[in-house]
C-alpha cells in the first residue's frame, strides 16, 4: 500500500533587511526561499542592528559585521552569521568635515572632535582602519563623540571595552551629530550615511576626500579587495536541523559585486 505523502508546512520567518535593490527579488516574491514563508521588514539598518542585538526581534536579519564579531567574542550573540553580505562599501564617502578648520587631509584630523553614531559600527571600523594604515591617524589621536545622526538620545547597542587612551564622549542629549557639525561643535562626522547638513548643502560641510569615489577606486586597485559591512544572521534559537535552516538563505542570496 502506497504511503501518503508527507506535507510539511513552511516556516513563517520574520526577515529584516535594508531596502537594497539586490534584495527586491526576494521581497517581491520573484525568488522563493525553500521551505520558508517569509515576512519581510524593510528597515533602516541601524534600527535593525539595535533591535537585533538588544532584543533579538527577528528570525533572520541583516547584521552589522563588527557588532556581530564583538557579541560573538563575548559569547552573547543571539544570532549565527551566514556568510552572505548584503552590503559592501568602500567608506571613503563616509567622512564629512568642517571645511573651515584647516583640514586638508586625513592627517589634519589629529586632535579634532569627530562624531560617530556608534563607535563600533562596521563603517566606522573600516574608516579607522584606513585612516591609521594610510594616514597614520590612530583612534587615540582624536576625541570621539557618540550620538544620534538625526535624532537625539541614541544609545550604543552593545557594551564596549576600549583601550584607556581612546576617548569616547556622549553628545548632549538635546543635540544631533548633524546639528553639531553644522554649528561647528564638531570638526567632522563619520558614518554610513551622509548627515542632513551635508545633503542640504551647508557651505561649511564637505567630504574629507575631494574625490571620494576616486580615492575608493585607487584603494581597490592597490589592494584588490572590497569591504563587507553587513552579513545575514539567523536566530540562534533555531536548530540547525530545521529544514536545513539557514541553508536556504545563502542559496537564494547574492553578495553585491565590489
Curated annotation (Swiss-Prot):
<dbReference type="InterPro" id="IPR015168">
    <property type="entry name" value="SsuA/THI5"/>
</dbReference>
<keyword id="KW-0210">Decarboxylase</keyword>
<keyword id="KW-0614">Plasmid</keyword>
<comment type="similarity">
    <text>To P.testosteroni DHP decarboxylase.</text>
</comment>
<keyword id="KW-0058">Aromatic hydrocarbons catabolism</keyword>
<dbReference type="GO" id="GO:0018796">
    <property type="term" value="F:4,5-dihydroxyphthalate decarboxylase activity"/>
</dbReference>
<protein>
    <recommendedName>
        <fullName>4,5-dihydroxyphthalate decarboxylase</fullName>
        <ecNumber>4.1.1.55</ecNumber>
    </recommendedName>
</protein>
<dbReference type="Pfam" id="PF09084">
    <property type="entry name" value="NMT1"/>
</dbReference>
<comment type="pathway">
    <text>Xenobiotic degradation; phthalate degradation; 3,4-dihydroxybenzoate from phthalate: step 3/3.</text>
</comment>
<keyword id="KW-0456">Lyase</keyword>
<dbReference type="GO" id="GO:0046239">
    <property type="term" value="P:phthalate catabolic process"/>
</dbReference>
